[in-house]
From Swiss-Prot:
This is Small ribosomal subunit protein uS14. Part of the 30S ribosomal subunit. Contacts proteins S3 and S10. Binds 16S rRNA, required for the assembly of 30S particles and may also be responsible for determining the conformation of the 16S rRNA at the A site. It comes from Delftia acidovorans (strain DSM 14801 / SPH-1). GO terms for cellular component: cytoplasm; small ribosomal subunit.
Length: 101
């Protein structure tokens, strides 16, 4: 089980990323637009640097919804590999069966 503080930190990052998503996308588009002047692009880059560090969506980490484990998380289920195995064997995940060929 992950520490509660680590899970809370991830939730904080999600909230910040959602809050600044529009501004982040706008500045990112301006900075990448080759048709704009160098001054505008530099100003956009400075604007990106002034945003909070945790507002960057790449800093988010997928975690298991049950255990908070950061590695081995399947996006489709939002669960770690160990919990997927447990729940699948118990029949709690619809449509998931043990492979046999």
């Amino acid at each position: 089980m992950a520490k509660v503080a680590l899970i809370q930190r991830e939730l904080k990052r999600e909230k910040l990323a959602a809050k600044y998503a529009a501004k982040y996308a706008e500045l990112k588009a301006i900075a990448a637009d080759a048709k704009r002047s160098d001054e505008e692009r530099d100003a956009a880059r400075l604007g990106l640097q002034k945003l909070p560090r945790n507002a960057n969506p790449t800093r988010q980490r997928n975690r298991c919804e049950i255990t908070g484990r950061p590695r081995g998380t399947f996006r489709q289920f939002g669960l770690g590999r160990a919990k997927i195995r447990e729940l699948a064997f118990a029949g709690d995940i619809p449509g998931v069966t043990k492979a046999s060929w």
